[in-house]
Structures are given as structure tokens and as C-alpha cells.
Amino acid sequence: MIYLDNAATTLHKPPQVEQAMLDALRTAGNPGRGAHEPTLHASRLVYAARCAISKLLNAPDPSCVAFAANATQALNTALGGLFAPGDHIITTVCEHNSVLRALYRLRDQEGVQLSFAGVDEKGRLQYDGWQELIQPNTKAVVVTGASNVTGNG
């Protein structure tokens, strides 16, 4: 079989992922929801993950690491908490729908201003003119690092 939908999900998981999934099914516990061993074990695993991620990102404390169900939820949480009315964001029309919807909501409901940087006919960033988009109230440039649609990075 030729599998061409890795953008949605990876067909074959590494053995470590398979094992972690089996372990989770066998020892399921809900972190922070009780004092029985499965819950305590799950809480320890979550804390260990927070510590590892905190160290990797040089965060000041493991409590600074927040988990979300998926990238869209994480993105909406981050964008929703960063900006105030009158703030300015630079982005492109080639961003993922989850990014653009969040930014349009900020514009339409929160009074955030958006500017769109140029891309060429293949969706590649065009850096000419970016400097002119920066305003005194610019708080972020929200641009994808690589597109799973065009393959551009």
C-alpha cells in the first residue's frame, strides 16, 4: 500500500509509540483525579514529561508547560491569550486554516489588526516589503515554518 496522508496521521508508529499506547491502555489512570496507584502513576508520567519539555525549552519551571489535545487547540489557546484590542499581527494568506480562523476571530471579535505578507504563485514567502508591515503596535509575526500543502519551508 502507498500511504499519502502523513499530513493527517502517520500510518506506521515506531515500536516505542506502540508500547507506550499499550502501557497506557493497561495502566490507565487519570492524572490528578484520585489517590489510587494508576492515577498516581499517570500523574508522575505527566510531571516527568513536563520536566523534560521544560528542560528542552529552557522554561523557568515545569509548571510553565501546558498540554493540549492537539495543535489546533494549543494554537487557539496561545493566540487567544496573547493579544489585546489594537495589537497588530503580521501573517500570510497561506497559513493553515486553524491559524487563519483564529486570527480572523481575533480581528473580528477582539479588535486585533492583521497585515498579510506577500507570497509568490507557489506559496513561497516573499520577503520584500515585510519591513513596511511592521508597526509600533506589532506584537507577533505568525508564519508557518513549512507547509504540508506546498512542501515549502
Segments from the language model and where they lie:
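Pyridoxal 5′-phosphate
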Residues: M1-G153
